[in-house]
Regions:
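Alpha-helical transmembrane segments in multipass membrane proteins, preferentially the mid-helix core
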Residues: 49-60, 123-127
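Alpha-helical membrane-associated segments of multi-pass integral membrane proteins
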Residues: 97-135
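Interfacial non-cytosolic loop connecting adjacent transmembrane helices
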Residues: 35-42, 81-112
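Juxtamembrane loop-transmembrane helix junctions in multi-pass integral membrane proteins
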Residues: 2-13, 34-35, 56-63, 67, ...
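Loop-to-transmembrane helix junctions at the membrane interface
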Residues: 55-87
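Cytosolic juxtamembrane helix and N-cap/initiation of the first transmembrane helix
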Residues: 1-22, 127-138
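Transmembrane alpha-helix entry/boundary detector in multi-pass membrane proteins
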Residues: 8-17, 26-53
Length: 138
């Protein structure tokens, strides 16, 4: 694995970084979901599939695996969108200082998870444009 990253192209390294950020976000989301009882399997699977696609691009190293970057971004985008929709009770209660929805938790973990997924998606998008030829076996 060490040699794989040492000889990897910039796009692969960025995709690896995106996978690590996404994995960290997945762990944070799982803890948040279990503690505040907001866990959603579809969000979890979308974020996990984003990690798998980003890592698949790094490990497969072929022309066919280039689409895995975009698949990772699509999965992360779907996951963060669904997470945002699922967190509307927290947004409504905390921003309006009411308890209409009886939400648990604060905005800090919600905003943190959203920002981490955005960071991961942006790094993955940048990795799509960094193919310098070393990353594709013939």
């Amino acid at each position: 694995m060490k040699n794989l990253l040492k000889n990897a192209a910039t796009g692969q390294k960025l995709s690896q970084l995106s996978a690590l950020i996404s994995l960290f976000t997945l762990i944070v989301y799982t803890i948040y979901g279990i503690v505040y009882i907001y866990f959603d399997w579809v969000v979890f699977l979308a974020l996990a599939l984003g990690v798998v696609c980003a890592e698949g691009y790094v490990l497969l190293n072929s022309r066919a695996s280039r689409c895995l970057n975009l698949a990772s971004v699509a999965c992360l985008s779907y996951g963060v969108g669904l997470f945002f929709l699922n967190s509307y009770p927290v947004w409504a209660d905390r921003l309006n200082n009411i308890s209409m929805y009886g939400s648990r938790g604060t905005l800090f973990p919600v905003i943190s998870i959203i920002l981490l997924v955005f960071a991961s998606a942006i790094v993955e998008i940048v990795s799509c444009f960094h193919t310098d030829g070393k990353d594709v076996n013939k």
